[in-house]
Amino acid sequence: MDTMNWLDQLKWDAQGLVPVIAQEAATGDVLMFAWMNREALAKTAELGRAVYYSRSRGKLWFKGEESGHVQQVHDIRLDCDSDVVLLKVTQLGHEPGIACHTGRHSCFFNALQNGAWQAVDPVLKDPESIYK
């Protein structure tokens, strides 16, 4: 694989990042949104495991490094404008199916109902017991 060539085809933002959506391969559920830099995307392709870039920590974030909730990557796709990446993943871990740091399946658990945001998906595991 010509690493430089395929990475150069993305439209990186001014900070050298690209937005990434993680989607559960089996169900199509959108699990989370994160960012990647070149190194994170190259590592993800190399390892077959999601590696993101943490803007708050300023470093690579190997999904599941603290929680054990790893994402096995089956497919990496680029949108038509070459500025958004889609990962099709299987969410693995001690409690398979937890992608969100809140202990939920998806980070998109709030729904707008009657003019207010309501949590509509259950907490599968207390986050305090995940992050010790």
UniProtKB/Swiss-Prot annotation:
Pathway: Amino-acid biosynthesis; L-histidine biosynthesis; L-histidine from 5-phospho-alpha-D-ribose 1-diphosphate: step 3/9. One of its GO terms (molecular function) is zinc ion binding. GO terms for cellular component: cytoplasm. It comes from the Bacteria. GO terms for biological process: L-histidine biosynthetic process. InterPro entries: PRA-CH (IPR026660), PRib_AMP_CycHydrolase_dom (IPR002496), PRib_AMP_CycHydrolase_sf (IPR038019). Disulfide bonds: none annotated. Mg(2+) binds at D79, D81, D83. Binds 1 Mg(2+) ion per subunit. Binds 1 zinc ion per subunit. HAMAP family: HisI (MF_01021). Catalyzes the hydrolysis of the adenine ring of phosphoribosyl-AMP. This is Phosphoribosyl-AMP cyclohydrolase. It comes from Acidovorax ebreus (strain TPSY) (Diaphorobacter sp. (strain TPSY)). The lineage of its organism: Bacteria, Pseudomonadati, Pseudomonadota, Betaproteobacteria, Burkholderiales. The gene is hisI.
